């Protein structure tokens, strides 16, 4: 019988599109973690930039996090994996890179996590507060944000929210992960965008002292984008309270090369 190449080379296909909300499905969660390939360069960014920001280490100037990467760079996959590890410590040992697995101990299982994808005409404040109230109710926390026209600033409301959360879940944090964030910002009109950016700045500011963490995925570095020059002043204030982590095409090339190498090893050593 003639053997076909397909009989020799078998490997897990690379998903063309991974959605953040896939991480909410138990049957997909483990697969997302075990199939995430990490280069040494990516491990450096995760271990030195992302995990310290997510951790509760008081020596760190905590900020919001923007994961920047065009379509196909693994942005949603990375956010899914990080949020799963933060939610459940058992996933940390499944990470393929030993340095990342070691660094992940600082966040493993230390958060209640809420993941959202934004495609709405609501204000950013309304989206975030509505989603957080749904999240809090799910986790047995009674809290409602005051109406937008009843607050001078939003930081006090976040402090009250985290105090209520800590009563039910002491020693844990809240991690809000948002995808499709750039598309949402692009859709906003000038005045509305300024208000959204002001709220985003406040989110970055509350991360400094509270156990609240915010991670969003964007397709380009918004602080350097010409399409947002009309709100440059607002963006500068946001930039001070956010860390940008850049993903590149070479990260995808490494994933493909690793998958093919694994397949080649199985051809040479099929046992």
Name what the model sees in each region.
Residues 1-29, 109, 119-123, 131-132, ...:
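Extended alpha-helical interface modules used as scaffolds for assembling large macromolecular complexes
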Residues 61, 83-112, 139-156, 218, ...:
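Flexible phosphate/Mg2+-sensing switch loops adjacent to catalytic phosphate-binding sites
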Residues 165-195, 217:
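Conserved P-loop NTPase "ATPase switch" module shared by AAA+ and STAND
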Residues 101-122, 126, 202-271:
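Conserved P-loop NTPase catalytic core
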Residues 78, 82:
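Hydrophobic positions on the alpha1 helix immediately C-terminal to the Walker A/P-loop
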Residues 63-70, 75-77, 112-114, 171-176, ...:
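Beta-sheet entry/capping signal
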Residues 1-73, 85, 234-244, 258-264:
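Walker A/P-loop-proximal flanking segment of P-loop NTPase domains
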Residues 25-31, 110-157, 178-190:
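Conserved P-loop NTPase mechanochemical-coupling segment
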């Amino acid at each position: 019988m003639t053997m076909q190449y397909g009989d020799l080379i078998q490997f897990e296909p690379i998903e063309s599109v991974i959605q953040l909300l896939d991480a909410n499905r138990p049957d997909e969660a483990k697969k997302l973690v075990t199939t995430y390939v990490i280069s040494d360069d990516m491990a450096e960014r995760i271990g030195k930039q992302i995990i310290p920001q997510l951790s509760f280490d008081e020596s760190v100037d905590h900020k919001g996090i923007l994961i920047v990467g065009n379509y196909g760079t693994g942005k949603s996959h990375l956010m899914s994996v990080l949020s799963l590890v933060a939610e459940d410590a058992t996933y940390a040992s499944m990470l393929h890179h030993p340095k990342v697995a070691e660094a992940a101990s600082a966040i493993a299982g230390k958060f209640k996590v809420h993941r959202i994808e934004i495609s709405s005409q609501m204000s950013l404040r309304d989206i975030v507060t509505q989603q957080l109230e749904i999240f809090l109710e799910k986790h047995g926390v009674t809290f409602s944000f005051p109406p937008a026209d009843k607050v001078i600033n939003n930081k006090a409301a976040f402090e009250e929210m985290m105090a209520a959360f800590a009563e039910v879940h002491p020693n844990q944090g809240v991690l809000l992960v948002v995808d499709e964030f750039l598309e949402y910002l692009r859709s906003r009109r000038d005045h509305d965008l300024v208000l959204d950016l002001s709220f985003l700045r406040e989110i970055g500011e509350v991360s400094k002292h509270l156990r609240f963490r915010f991670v969003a995925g964007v397709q380009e570095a918004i602080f350097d984008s010409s399409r947002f020059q009309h709100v440059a002043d607002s963006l500068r204030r946001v930039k001070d309270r956010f860390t940008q982590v850049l993903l590149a095409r070479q990260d995808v090339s490494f994933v493909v090369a690793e998958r093919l190498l694994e397949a080649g090893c199985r051809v040479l050593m099929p046992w």
